[in-house]
């Protein structure tokens, strides 16, 4: 045992002599082979990469203790730019020479125990070269511990002090130590990096915890040979990887920069190293030192030799290339010029300025790009120009704005910026001063965000704020506070507190705007010191004495700091006790909005907000829009790690619907940071009053003594602070306020003066008009570097890796404008006279924009660049060349536009990703390789599989398939990676050949998503989008395009083509021969079908079964249309029977032409007009007819199935006439042939239907029909054709029967229609919903809508025929405005019956049991009273009201273009509007839009095509009832519509559920009609509605949707039926209702009164004293209304209305009438005079009620009937009134506000406070106010006390005795009994106004008194 221990001890002692620490012995030279490689690119194979490789030999010599010399020689450099990994490095001789020149001089470094110390090098060694040395020495940095094999430490390196983990393995036999160390370059105490351009963004810590956009790690492997004396590194390998992704690092895709190093020992020689005889300076440590990369832009590389000459050349080139047009490379050229300006000095600037400053185009570019250079030299140059006054104020403002926001806050820049602000910002509050200070504050913000001190710039603003406060200069105070908000430093809090209410003695006296700005200034400070800001804002919010608006803004700032749950619960508790609904509603809506956020940094807060909302919902969930609210929309995509949030909040004042302040803010989450790109705030107050009253100074107060005399009689009356009319706004970008402005009353009045006043008083207007007459030619360009974001980190090789984003743009506006004004303006010309002048305006303008966005990742130095570059370019060019003639008096506008003669690109967007290498010594060899190339795809992906037996035909099939794949746009579908190499190309053109132009959109895309379907790979590649105008060439050229608009009486004179509609009767003769041929073919087919009927039975049955299984809905409108075209005999025979009786109605229903016509006849005639144009295009061949019949028969099964639901009702009708049998769809039978016959009859009927099919149509049915058509037998087709022929003949013969049969038929049709329509509409709510689930749906979902039009009409029997016609249409719920309403009704019946729900039959049966009276009334209005009876073409009876002609003027003078004419006919109960668009050429294409507005109903249609018959969309809006509540329904239906509309609507429908969910709608899936949209709204309360929206496939509903105005709901649910509503006042009534929402009414009667805020009180009024009912409570009152009883016994009152222009008294006379005096003159005294008006005051009588209107004074009206007084004030008086009627602010807690702004403790005390006392009792009022002593001595704080009232109490005058008393509650202030003052001293004391209330007690107050003798 002892021997073992001894051996261990000896071994341990021996090992202590071993040296693991690498070292370099003195007088030894260690030679290594060194290789470093850098790669930049995408990690996937097959894509392009760039790289750099450097090979060399490195000699390290020991030249002293702990001092070594390193020398690099034999350098060989190579570049890589090609497909990875197949390409290879290519040697670069010039790069080798450049590196050899930089690394030829050796350097010294300290080295001890594996640690590199200071580096010493001559000054001739560049920073870039020294960094390469650092890359090699970084390998030598080792921290080895002998006794540990695995450990982690913080180790210094080239990238900083980072977390490093070691793993050591020892091979004792070979005396080798294997060392592996790994560095986490994201976990560094002192990380070496430079980040610029992101100072205005905030890091999202939660986002960075979830996802790292940038990761970097390095792994080192060493082999160390050790002996007892030394250890030598024999081999070292380093691999460092930098990974970057803009999206999620796992699912988003990555770009990498990979660095590798190899160091291998060759030999060790004992020799003395040769040290160069140069002076070595300490040049820092191992950590990387930034050098040329800070000045070198990564987007280009070029040599700078003669910078001044190069600036001149680049500037001249930029001006010349952008003079005519703006090329796409203009931003790149501007960026190169800016790079040169950064490299230049002040002498260069001065030389260039002298040469070009006098030339406007050059001067503009210099003033744009010099500030963007963002150096202290450019700032100094600009400051000198300001000192010499060589720049205008506008030029100074824009240069300072750009320069200070673009500059980095170095010490030199801060010094120059401080001088500019102190010396050159004017003292006046001009725009320039605001820009200077706000921009300097933003620069100070960046300085404070850096490690450097910012105390100097902070001191500038603190002193400025103190001086502004001392001078009470409000504008300067606002500017100082906004500047402190931009700085956002916690040191400014104590200075901001001076302006906050509750923190400084005089702060409460400052204007409200100052308080608002001070609170908002804390917002940016809260980002740095959230705890301090939370404490301040929470205290402000909890202080109810502070204005509600300030408290709400404090809450906004508080929630921006993301407080925790405890603070939020304090907030919730305060809101539950909050007296102000404005504040409570605002906080609740804000918390609810935040609770829905999905952003990572708000998840904790969102959870807490949801808890808070649960506590607040029961109380505040139904608050209306009259209260302040916050609206917020946000989304965050996890796979992109990006999000967007938009917040909008409104602050209302006094419950007005018009907000006082509105703020909109946009927030983004990207790259792990949060930014607020834009924030806009607008505030306005008093504008309503100013616009109503006009401009009038506040002189009314001085000239009317009555107000002052009256107000003296109130106790301690205090006026409300008057808000001067103003409008203000501000703009913030990235949290920094750029500009703010404020328009006061005088400014707004000056703006109005510009319009209404003569221009001789405003010289600028006169100069502008003169310039326009002579012609103005201007060219303006603006070059901007909008964004420069850079992140630079070192790599282990010594080269810097940069990730950067550049966004530059050049904008150009050029134009010439000349105006000819007739008659020529005189010297006293006003702008309003332009309305009576003729103006000819000739303008040629162009707007061009070129934008260039570049993203770079890779290596960037001034010697070499290698990396990935993604370039996105946007080019837009909008030319405008118009000659316009405007004749306002004649209501005529004429414009001429030149034709399109060459292709013009409007916008081009392109994006491409390159692998780029550039070498400063060999710029010609620069290489930009697209990252994605076709040859980059591996060969195996290009190969196709060829079978041994494959033939040429299969090759052709494969080729065709590949072409189809590319053309279909699926070339990059996942799972077909080989197609990814082929570009996706799509081109779409909209051809307007009429005007010789077409608009084309071309898209091209090829990306790398076929390799990996992630966002980054979708972006990599090449994408292009181009929108252009192309000429359409024709035989005759177009000279110009002319647009003429003529309104008024001269509109018909501008018509080029007379609008007429072709009568189908005129087409009959031309098509008669065609019809005979078709009839003969059908007869032949009929005979064949009869012979084969039995054999075709089975086939027809199987086909119908197949059709049923392959279609989801019973019918298709597309198939209906084809059936109508393929069965011409239907039109033939029906036309032959009624052609002579028919009259053509292009805008109406032909069925209404005669009341004696039968329903079937009308239906047939109607179908003629709708299908005539289509029938003419039918094929003559029998195969065509057979095919059409065959396609229509595929619906046989669905027809049979639908007919079963109406079997009982249709069987009786089928016996009477075949027409009604067709409408009933026949009765199903057991045989297939009869079933097919019923189907064909339904198909025939549907072919006549051109209206709106319902959900029974399947979109995919057409393809099924086409497939089935190929397999059907000819015998089956013949059978169907024969049956069709027979049914048609039967229908025709039936329609020519006697009138009695026709009458019965019409009656049956009418009843059947009523049943089906009612069944259809009643069943929509529950369609496709099982019975057991119906009960779980909301009630509103199941309610029936009942139109109110029938009820309205029943009370208006004497109205016009058009009104009665609409009654019938409204009650049937059919869109009878169609030109073929009969066929529509039949189709609606079919659609209704086709739904196989038993509820339909039940509801139809229920509707058939209506009262006989109802049916009789319906039938009474049926004949000749359709809604569309008078909707014939209005152009036949009235001229057009407006004509618009767009004409292409041809050289042969032929008409080409379009003409639109509008017709309007209106009366008291109906408005009929029609718009017809026709081609100027003689074609039958037309577009028709018509609308009818009736009481309680409006209807509109849009139709276009041949004679307006091909396509149609119709809408019907109706008022009615749902569950006996007022309801409105909007129904939109459509027939055949173009495919692009279908595709667009289908695409939009995908977003409907998501949008509905965000808006709060609930969803229920239903098979709603496929061609119908219904919106229903039912008023559930005066403030809320229930809404149901039915769209195809889904039903949405919302219960309790709040509306921003009170709905006019009467006591009876049908009150609207008797109101005198006309077509003209229906919509204005709704607008008036919204406008009147802000008007308030107060009512005062005997002992009751109801305030403006609808609070009712009952308390005693004084018997003989006047009491203030309502008054304007501002500093300068505009009205005061008082009232008092005439005598003690009477209930009658007298009213005094005092305004600033008149005193009006209304008092009762002996005969119970009312006497009115105005300014002591009797008015309305004569029996014949019922109205008096003077000085904007109107007085009139309505029966016994006197009404006074003074809107200019704020009084909408005052109604008084002798007992009840009603006062209605204008909307702009909200929150500005006082008196018994309250303050009119919609707040319930402050109704009992006394004149001194204290809340009364009781109603009686409140009323008594507004009593007007008199000095003597001769006037009848015998009361006075006295302070009283409490008749007991309460114990306060343990002491017996004497108490005196804080407010006076009404008592009788001296020598008067009270007759009647009442009890009032009064507050008392108490003194200790021993030291109490007397009552007399208390009355004289001034302390009582601010004394606290210790107790509240009830005391007696006198109401009425009796007096003896003189009283006082």
From Swiss-Prot:
Q: What induces it?
A: By steroids (estrogen).
Give the InterPro entries listed for this entry: Lipid_transp_b-sht_shell (IPR015819), Lipovitellin_superhlx_dom (IPR011030), Vitellinogen_b-sht_N (IPR015816), Vitellinogen_b-sht_shell (IPR015258), Vitellinogen_b-sht_shell_sf (IPR037088), Vitellinogen_open_b-sht (IPR015255), Vitellinogen_open_b-sht_sub1 (IPR015817), Vitellogenin/Apolipophorin (IPR050733)
**What keywords are assigned to this protein?**
Allergen, Disulfide bond, Glycoprotein, Phosphoprotein, Signal, Storage protein
Q: Where is the composition biased (Low complexity)?
A: 1092-1124, 1150-1235, 1273-1299, 1357-1381
A GO term for molecular function: lipid transporter activity
| The keyword Signal is annotated on this UniProt entry | yes
Q: Where is the composition biased (Polar residues)?
A: 1319-1328
Task: Give glycosylation sites per the record.
Answer: 163, 991, 1206, 1375, 1662, 1698, 1703
Covalent S-S links between cysteines: 1642-1781, 1665-1817
Q: Residue spans with biased composition (Basic and acidic residues)?
A: 1259-1269, 1306-1316
Ranges for domain VWFD come to 1640-1818
Q: What does this chain do?
A: Precursor of the egg-yolk proteins that are sources of nutrients during early development of oviparous organisms.
What is the protein's given name?
Vitellogenin-1
Organism annotation: Gallus gallus (Chicken)
Name the gene that codes for it: VTG1
